[in-house]
Amino acid sequence: MADLDQASPTRRTAETAAADRKDLAVSVSGDRETAADRRRRRLSIIGTVFSAALFLGSFVVLWRILGKIDLDELSTAFRSASLRQITIAIILTAVSYALLTGYDYVALKQLGERIAYRITAFASFTSYAISFTLGFPLVTGGTVRYWVYSPHGIKAAKIASLTVIAGITFWLGMSVVLSWSLVRHAAEVSVLAKTGLSLTQLTGVAGFAALAAYFIWVIWKHPVVNVRGWRLELPRARLSFIQMLIGAGDVCAAAGVLFVLLPGGHGLSYETFLAVYVVACMLGIASHAPGGIGVFEATILIALDRLPTGGVLGALLLFRLLYYLVPFVIALAMLFVHETRRRVNRANARAAGPDSK
């Protein structure tokens, strides 16, 4: 009995130590949770600041664009364009933006992410409509995608990868359309570009050669890009071919919007105009101006200098309105509703507490 009494304090000491360790573990766990909460709160604040900055910047750009529009010129452009022209332009705009959703769809497939198409379409449409107008697509488009995709478990690194893969889709489409137009309609393009026929054909052949080299690379090699610890596995041949088709379809639809708005009697074939449009887009992208504004228009005007300048300017103004400004305003409204709804739901969930279930 005495032995038991002597052992009892030892057992109590051991039990007390175990309890202390358990309390310490709970305390540390609580500290970790608190630190995680603090990190989430900081990220939420940063996200709110970025959201506010992007929305404010968007409305500033929108205000400036609207301020530069001459209402008389806009009215003249609308009067000179027929209802049929405007209707076809609207349809082609919708087709182009619908194909743009394929950019994100292919990228998500490559990254192994399964996201509902309605979410993909929303993220794609809003990100492109915003970045087309504001410029700097890696920043503006990436930010919008982060807003939409992050609640569905897609991390920032994968969103960056998605943006790069979508960019590859765009450039594959641009390259094949330009190369085809330069080779197939070299004579007409040479007249517009004021270059020699041989140079035009050679440029088109070089474009096809570059595309062939890319496809050989993705077929025979395991295409992986490593940049300072960031690793991206590029799509293989089958998915790359789908990328090229989607990109080409988008470029053709977008070019069609401007083509149908041009004044009648220009005698320019759509296939020839594709080369003019793609080169204008490339120069606009190189200028880093939002939507390539100014550079794009100047390139089109120089290439189509045989057409009435007023008519081409009117077509360009309508093109900016239908393809850029209207989708931009729609995207802003959609994002505003989306962000407001998400923040209201989050506030309601916090107010309800963990016992609401």
Pin down the residues of each PLM region.
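Hydrophobic alpha-helical membrane segments of integral membrane proteins
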Residues: W147-V148, A160-T163, I168, S175, ...
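Membrane-interface alpha-helices at helix entry/exit sites of multi-pass transporters
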Residues: R118-F122, P137, G141, P151-G167, ...
